[in-house]
């Protein structure tokens, strides 16, 4: 199974100062479409738009609609749940009667579960009892199939960040960690938000962040050849090694 992960596109077609972000995403989508073999799935781990107004999601849909493989999304702190549902109505995984954007994807070699880490009050992450109970129920439905979760906020400390803790408080991280405790079939967590390539753990699950597609807000050290290119990650799964990750610069 091959997963392409993109994140933190921060589209804002109303602000000419950040028009480059549109080109960054277009280049990224074109590069994914040229891959051979194509990924089985693309996951966008949030901050699709720089703030959740309709025109920004319309632009996102225009570009992301060009993908030649299925797209699944988790919401970032800059996103709006209602606008995501309105602009991606054809995707039945975004059910209108759910409070949070959390759902399983069952049709691949690895089961994927999107988690909603939006806080109602800050740009940091949150995870409440409702979301934790939903995750536990979803995990219990299939304890045998390898499973990966994807979410916006990384639930581990990033020491070189201005805000090492990416959640509102440690209690929210503990809520998530407890829900994953003993879930041996959960083999990976994919995150965004930090705008950099960084790894950690949540409970006993290896976790990683993908750099932002938007070059102007990307953080971290990269080869010189990456400087002017949007970056995304390819996660390749096999049953012997689990996930192997490649950070790729779009041409």
What is the predicted function of each stretch?
Residues 11-15, 82, 121-123, 157-162, ...:
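A short acidic, helix-capping loop that chelates divalent metal ions and anchors anionic groups
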Residues 54-136, 141, 172-176, 181-185, ...:
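Extended active-site neighborhood of metal-dependent phosphoesterases/phosphodiesterases
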Residues 16-20, 161-168, 222-224:
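Short glycine-enriched, charge-decorated loop/helix-capping segments at active-site entrances
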Residues 5-7, 40-47, 71-77, 116, ...:
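Active-site neighborhood of phospho(di)ester-bond hydrolases with catalytic His/Asp-centered motifs
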Residues 28-41, 124-206, 231-234, 242-244:
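His/acidic metal-ligating clusters that form di-metal
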Residues 2-11, 109-119, 148-150, 205-211, ...:
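Active-site-proximal beta-strand elements of phosphoester/diester hydrolases
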Residues 11, 50, 119, 155, ...:
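Short, glycine/acidic-enriched loop or turn micro-motifs at the edges of active sites
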Residues 1-59, 158:
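N-terminal active-site segment of His-dependent metallophosphoesterases
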């Amino acid at each position: 199974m091959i997963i392409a992960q993109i994140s933190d596109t921060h589209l804002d077609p109303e602000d000419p100062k950040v028009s480059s972000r549109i080109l960054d995403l277009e280049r990224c989508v074109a590069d994914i479409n040229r891959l051979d073999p194509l990924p089985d799935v693309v996951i966008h781990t949030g901050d699709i738009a720089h703030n959740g107004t309709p025109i920004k999601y319309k632009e996102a849909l225009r570009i992301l609609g060009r993908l030649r493989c299925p797209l699944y999304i988790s919401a970032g702190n800059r996103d709006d749940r209602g606008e995501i549902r309105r602009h991606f109505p054809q995707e039945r995984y975004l059910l209108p009667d759910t409070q949070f954007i959390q759902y399983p994807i069952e049709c691949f070699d690895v089961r994927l579960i999107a988690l909603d880490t939006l806080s109602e009050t800050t740009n940091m992450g949150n995870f409440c009892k409702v979301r934790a109970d939903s995750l536990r129920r979803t995990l219990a439905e299939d304890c045998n199939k390898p499973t990966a979760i994807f979410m916006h906020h990384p639930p581990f400390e990033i020491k070189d960040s201005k805000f090492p803790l990416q959640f509102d408080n440690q209690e929210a991280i503990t809520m998530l960690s407890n829900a994953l405790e003993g879930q041996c079939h959960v083999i990976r967590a994919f995150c965004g938000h930090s705008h950099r390539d960084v790894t950690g753990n949540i409970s006993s699950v290896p976790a990683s962040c993908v750099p932002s597609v938007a070059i102007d807000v990307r953080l971290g050290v990269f080869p010189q050849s990456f400087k002017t290119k949007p970056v995304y990650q390819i996660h390749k799964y096999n049953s012997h090694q689990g996930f192997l990750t490649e950070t790729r610069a779009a041409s």
